[in-house]
Amino acid sequence: MARVSLIKEGERPELSDLIGTIRAERGGRFPNLYRALLNSPSVAEGWLKFFTAVRQKAKLHGRYRELAILRVALLNGADYEYRAHVPFALQEGVTQAQIDALPGWQVSAKFDDRERAVLAYTDCVTREIRAPDPIFAELRRHFDDRELVELTATVAGYNLVSRFLEAMQIDHEK
């Protein structure tokens, strides 16, 4: 059960425009994550803008974004984040076999060199904050500066998401 109130639609009329924007940016959905964030409208608004940029306005292919997000969720034990992003990962071309192999990606043949570079970087940034030069050099072989910034923002951002969800004990929608 969430540690803060989950704002219901219509409960606070002054939030109706922001809720409409959330629904528009999130495919008509009003997730529990945003219902919790709306306890601080300015945080909810900034969060929405940042994650819309990361997910919908980035050059980085969604396949790599979603692999990184799922890996962050696994490393942080963030069930909500993981469950929410499996469908997006599948839509972006990640296979179910790859999703199943993510816990032990290092020994799996399901990932190509680019995907392995993304996962190694995600592991380092999530666990240690800094990635060693050889890990970053391998990543740089596959991605340009814009994509590197977007991937790093994705990994850092979804570490924020998982920590927020777990600290606030937000449950996934039923």
What name fits each language-model region?
Residues 1-174:
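Hydrophobic alpha-helical segments
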